[in-house]
Regions:
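Metalloprotease/metallohydrolase-associated module, dominated by Zn2+-dependent proteases
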Residues: 29-109, 153-208
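Sec/Tat signal peptide C-region and signal peptidase I cleavage site
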Residues: 21-26
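Mid-length scaffold segments of soluble, non-membrane domains
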Residues: 86, 90, 96-143
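Structured segments of extracytoplasmic/periplasmic soluble domains
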Residues: 124, 132-153, 173, 177-184, ...
Length: 208
């Protein structure tokens, strides 16, 4: 009778882890939470300044951002030894995302024009951060499939090492995907915001 062995195989934080005839089982666990930081202002310049000084910082940087998504990967795998070979019998990848968004606390009394600009910008910030969370969930699924597809090894120690290497590579790939997304978004930011603002103005019948 083969004996299962369970090990934690990955844990990473970003400012972005039976019987012999049973098939390998996967179970991605994704959770998401939200938090907010308050900003104040009566003009677009004041709101912009507040975002620049009160926004969250990204991992490894002191620069402030209008929004952020903290990502934490984790997981565990169960290995089963039989016939001189060890394989993964169960893998569970977890990913928790915390989306940090701005909240305009003294909006009452603001002009319709400024409110429309803010609604356009804040909606785009939320969309951007939600996409970061989605990229993390998609990568967790890829990592899980790759781990379950790994070939059996001579020992469970070797199997665990291979899982660790695969997990590390998956997280590195995740970081590159997130950076590429940010680069594309930055290039298109101004045109995108102007287009969204024009669409919002048209749908509301204009700003008075």
């Amino acid at each position: 009778m083969p004996s299962p062995t369970r090990h934690m195989f990955l844990l990473a934080a970003l400012c972005l882890t039976a019987s012999i005839c049973s098939p390998a089982v996967a179970a991605v666990v994704a959770t998401k939470s939200y938090s907010y930081f308050d900003i104040k202002g009566k003009t677009a310049d004041e709101l912009d300044q507040q975002l620049s000084t009160r926004g969250p910082t990204a991992s490894g940087s002191s620069a402030r951002h209008p929004g952020a998504t903290k990502i934490r990967f984790g997981g565990e795998a169960t290995y089963i030894q039989d016939g001189g070979r060890c394989r993964v019998s169960h893998a569970k990848v977890t990913v928790h995302t915390q989306i940090i968004l701005p909240r305009w606390s003294n909006r009452n009394g603001a002009s319709k024009q400024l409110s429309m600009i803010w609604d356009t910008l804040s909606s785009d910030i939320k969309r951007h951060e939600e996409r970061h969370a989605e990229i993390a969930r998609e990568q967790a699924k890829k990592m899980e499939k790759r781990i379950l597809a790994l070939p059996p090894q001579r020992t469970c120690e070797a199997m665990q090492e291979l899982v660790t290497v695969t997990s590390t590579r998956g997280i590195e790939e995740h970081d590159r995907l997130q950076a590429r997304f940010d680069q594309v978004e930055a290039v298109n930011f101004q045109n995108r915001i102007l287009r969204l603002l024009n669409n919002r103005i048209k749908s509301s019948g204009g700003v008075h």
